[in-house]
Each structure stands twice: as C-alpha cells, then as structure tokens.
C-alpha cells in the first residue's frame, strides 16, 4: 500500500483551486481514469467523494472502497440503502433507485465542482432531508464565474438529472 504523504483531496482543496488549469485537468483525468478502471471491472464505488488520496506530484488514488459493489449486486437486489455524502449522492439514488455506474459519474461532477470552488458542494447548508428533496428537484451548486465553458458543459452533463444523459 502506498503512503499518501500529501493527504486527501479534501485537505488540499484550497491548493487545488489555485492550480493552473493544466494541473487541475491532469488531476481530474487521473481521478476519472481510476473510476473508469473500477467501472471496467464492473464495480460501482457507491461512496465517491473527496476520498481521493494525493500520493505525490498530482498522482491521485481513489480510496474508501468499502461500499464498492459489483454492478450485478444492484441488478439482482432489492437493496435501496443510500450510502455516501449527501451532495455526492445522485438524485435517482435519493429517490430509491439502485446505484449505477452513472451514479458515480454524478458524484464525479461534484468533485469537478470542488476543484473550481475550493469548498464542499452546499457547504453553507445542512445536509438534511430538505437538501435531499432539493437535489431531487434539480438543485445543483452555483456555477462559478470565469470557468471555461467546456468545463461547465461537461460538469453539467455529469450532474444531469437523467442518468442516461450522463457520460460514461
């Protein structure tokens, strides 16, 4: 097991926001490549948020795989348990639908938002039932100004209300 000398993504958010775009995109590419590797093995993370370790020099590693389950688990199970940190949980999961690969993509959109804001999504609100309802009605974090349009468009696609419209 590798030691994460630079802590977690969450503990480095303020530094990440200050990074040049090329570094942010390199880090996000590293994260989505790790998630793709999990998905290629037909697993769903189910608790994807700032639990990403910064091993060294922009080499990131997804951690906290304790709730990770095979895709088939949700296809054959009536399990409607909700795992994770509220703003990172996809709206369809909050409505009782099973986790899917696209649920993790929704979570990735919140990580994208953290990279440009430096704070947790909805950091100034209680993580409660009302926020769950609001997310299910389409509430998303406020778009930060002066962010490249292509980045915003991708982030919005990843947090689309319809999981079938999210990139995979």
Predicted regions and their residues:
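Conserved short submotifs of the Hanks-type protein kinase catalytic core
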Residues: 2-8
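Catalytic-loop of the protein kinase fold
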Residues: 39-55
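Conserved catalytic-loop aspartate of Hanks-type protein kinases
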Residues: 104
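Activation segment of protein kinase catalytic domains, centered on the conserved DFG
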Residues: 14-29
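Conserved activation segment of eukaryotic-like protein kinases, specifically the C-terminal portion
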Residues: 78-93
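A conserved short helix/loop substructure at the end of the activation segment
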Residues: 159-168
């Amino acid at each position: 097991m590798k030691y994460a000398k630079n802590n977690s993504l969450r503990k480095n958010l303020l530094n990440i926001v200050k990074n040049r775009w090329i570094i942010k995109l390199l880090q996000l590419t590293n994260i989505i490549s790790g998630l793709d590797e999990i998905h290629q093995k037909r697993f769903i993370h189910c608790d994807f948020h700032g639990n990403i370790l910064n091993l060294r020099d922009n080499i990131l590693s997804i951690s906290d795989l304790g709730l990770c389950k095979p895709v088939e688990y949700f296809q054959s199970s009536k399990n409607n348990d909700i795992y994770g940190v509220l703003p990172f949980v996809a709206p369809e999961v909050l409505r009782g639908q099973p986790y899917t690969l696209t649920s993790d993509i929704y979570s990735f959109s919140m990580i994208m938002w953290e990279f440009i804001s430096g704070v947790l999504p909805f950091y100034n609100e209680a993580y409660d039932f009302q926020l769950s309802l609001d997310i299910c009605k389409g509430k998303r974090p406020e778009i930060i100004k002066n962010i490249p349009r292509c980045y915003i468009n991708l982030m919005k696609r990843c947090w689309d209300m319809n999981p079938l419209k999210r990139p995979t």
